[in-house]
């Protein structure tokens, strides 16, 4: 999570294949590569005016959560950038975090929510992104079916592509 100079917060999920999300620069510094996503870059804008960040790391199947707090900066080139390449995608930026605090958070919330128990999941309880989009922009020329197809393809394609 980040916050702008007015204290307005933003939290944005990050993800890469197991073992490739975070690069350990040294004992007190980590780097997280920029990856194509929704292209909003809210968190990066926030870091430019307020370097304070809070990170939560969720590992599927584990109840505890690794939490890191620190000061971040954006870098566009560093010796470790080759280590950030995933599936041929060379990041144009990395978020470098100087760690000030690191600790594990207990598993009670995940245990109560049964987050890692697929048999408890109810994906149809919430409307889809396409349904929410159509409901909030009813004059959109796209049908719900077109939006469902678009979002399905958008999530699957271009995750690591070089095009933006």
Residue ranges of predicted features:
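Binding-site signature for planar aromatic cofactors or substrates
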Residues: 1-164
């Amino acid at each position: 999570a980040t916050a702008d100079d007015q204290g307005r917060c933003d939290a944005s999920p990050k993800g890469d294949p197991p073992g490739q999300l975070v690069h350990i620069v040294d004992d007190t510094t980590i780097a997280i590569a920029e990856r194509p996503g929704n292209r909003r870059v809210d968190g990066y804008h926030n870091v430019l005016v307020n370097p304070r960040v809070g990170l939560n790391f969720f590992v599927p199947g584990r109840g505890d959560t690794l939490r890191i707090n620190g000061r971040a900066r954006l870098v566009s080139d560093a010796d470790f950038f080759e280590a950030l390449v995933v599936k041929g995608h060379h990041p144009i930026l990395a978020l470098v975090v100087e760690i000030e605090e690191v600790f594990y958070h207990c598993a009670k919330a995940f245990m109560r929510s049964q987050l890692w128990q697929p048999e408890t999941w109810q994906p149809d309880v919430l409307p889809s992104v396409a349904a929410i989009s159509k409901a909030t922009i009813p004059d959109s020329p796209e049908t719900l079916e077109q939006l469902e197809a678009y979002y399905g393809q958008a999530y699957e394609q271009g995750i690591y592509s070089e095009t933006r």
